[in-house]
């Protein structure tokens, strides 16, 4: 069964870029959510291998770290790995302190190092 990545808070073009990057390197399905509520709902409904959360959510510019904290605080799904998508190291450090795996920025989308970060979660 293919791995599943849930991408939260990205606009359509960025979501499609992430989906294309993932599908070109892994046999994984990429699903889109837009905020904490629909992400938590999806995490409760199916097995998810990784969640990526945009630093600033596309629809309302909510801080993605708030989504991360809600996921990590949930006793039913808090063990699902989460990455914050940001180009800024200080935000990566805040995310790691909140329980995230090291994420990546959109500027590094095509880098081999990004695939190396994703491989432990999306490789079969």
Predicted regions and their residues:
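Short hydrophobic/Thr-rich beta-strand motif most characteristic of the beta2 strand and flanking loop
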Residues: 27-35
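Conserved phosphotransfer microenvironments
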Residues: 52-71
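A short, hydrophobic beta-strand element within the central beta-sheet of small alpha/beta folds
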Residues: 78-89
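Receiver (REC) domain switch/output surface
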Residues: 113-124
């Amino acid at each position: 069964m293919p791995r599943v990545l849930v991408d939260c808070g990205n606009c359509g073009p960025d979501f499609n870029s992430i989906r294309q990057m993932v599908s070109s390197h892994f046999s994984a399905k990429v699903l889109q959510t837009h905020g904490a509520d629909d992400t938590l709902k999806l995490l409760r409904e199916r097995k998810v291998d990784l969640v990526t959360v945009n630093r600033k959510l596309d629809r309302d510019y909510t801080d993605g770290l708030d989504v991360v904290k809600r996921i990590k605080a949930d006793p039913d799904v808090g063990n699902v790995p989460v990455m914050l998508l940001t180009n800024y190291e200080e935000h990566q450090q805040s995310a790691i302190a909140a329980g995230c795996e090291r994420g990546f920025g959109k500027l590094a989308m095509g880098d081999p190092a990004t695939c190396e970060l994703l491989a432990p979660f999306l490789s079969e």
